[in-house]
Amino acid sequence: MINKAVEQIDDLLEPQDWSFPVPIVYGPGRLSEISTHCLGMGIQNPLIVTDKGSAHLPFIKQLQDFLSLANIPSALFGEVSPNPLEKDILAGREKFHNGKHDAVIAIGGGSAMDGGKSICLTANNNYSIWDFEFEQPVPIIHQDQPFPTLVTIPTTAGTGAETESTAMVTDVNKGMKFCVWHPDLK
């Protein structure tokens, strides 16, 4: 009976490709494929976004090394708070612009996912992060201001934030977390 359970667990770890509605590449060791995926999506200079707790962990260096080996320059923004704040998003947006990045790779847990998605929401337009608040009318994104390409790499088992266009951001003035989103962010 134990052997059967082990076999079932092993089956879950087999490499798989899904679409939910975004493509999902799943399985141990798949980080090594990041350059191939970036090149396939036309990504030339991504901003890597993660939380403060993950910024110095080995998988960040591995990601940077895989990109570098494929001659894909990147920069790291590792300043996302455990519950992302507007100031984190503004600082990430500034780093995105200053580095002339064309994509965001969000890697880490839910906060990194939320930070990366929020930076994408505001990167190429003049909207505030609060203009994307879930209860508000959806902002119009013009063709000349598309969202940057977003790649999400979850390192924790959690809410599935990597599959959604929503993010949670904390408004310190109101002492509340708000859901921000746009249906075109994928």
Write out the residue ranges for each language-model feature:
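A general structural motif
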Residues: 43-45, 101, 147
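Hydrophobic residues at beta-strand termini and immediately following loops
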Residues: 25-26, 77-80, 153, 180
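A glycine/threonine-rich phosphate-anchoring loop and its flanking beta-alpha core
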Residues: 125-186
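Conserved beta-strand elements of the Class I
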Residues: 47-48, 103-105, 151
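An N-terminal, well-structured beta->alpha segment
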Residues: 1-77
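N-terminal small/polar loop signature for handling phosphorylated ligands or for N-terminal nucleophile
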Residues: 55-129
